[in-house]
């Protein structure tokens, strides 16, 4: 029973396919923007779990994986990829440094105003 469900999950490719199989409602606008982030977070939640899927029924697995996918999806409903830091590029990103004052230095002050006079031919 559970093996056939797991095989179905292994064959899924698109994020929408996971949501349909697990019967999780979603906003297509959120999914379009964060599909890779949601699927990676879903994978992270599965990896962090310690459930023995071999002893579960298909319905139990559907509920279990559905709850993890829904949790991953909700992470991005009211948040951003930068805040959630799913991928390495965001995890390693340094916080913005405070702005420093930029001073203007005129060319005249560097080379002297008298040297800038143009010559007419």
Swiss-Prot record:
UniProt keywords, alphabetically: Nitrogen fixation
Membrane-spanning intervals of the chain: none
GO biological process, one term: nitrogen fixation
HAMAP family reported in the protein's UniProt record: NifW
Protein role: May protect the nitrogenase Fe-Mo protein from oxidative damage.
Record family assignment: Belongs to the NifW family.
Record text on subunit structure and interactions: Homotrimer; associates with NifD.
Protein name, entry field: Nitrogenase-stabilizing/protective protein NifW
Species of origin: Methylacidiphilum infernorum (isolate V4) (Methylokorus infernorum (strain V4))
Gene: nifW
């Amino acid at each position: 029973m559970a093996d056939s469900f797991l095989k179905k999950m292994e064959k899924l490719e698109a994020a929408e396919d996971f949501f349909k199989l697990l019967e999780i409602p979603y906003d297509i606008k959120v999914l379009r923007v964060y599909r890779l982030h949601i699927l990676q977070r879903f994978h992270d939640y599965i990896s962090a779990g310690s459930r023995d899927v071999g002893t579960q029924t298909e319905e139990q697995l559907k509920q279990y994986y559905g709850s993890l996918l829904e949790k991953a999806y909700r992470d991005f409903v009211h948040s951003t990829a930068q805040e959630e830091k799913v991928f390495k590029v965001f995890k390693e990103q340094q916080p913005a440094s405070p702005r420093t004052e930029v001073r203007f230095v005129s060319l005249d002050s560097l080379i002297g105003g008298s040297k800038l006079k143009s010559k007419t031919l």
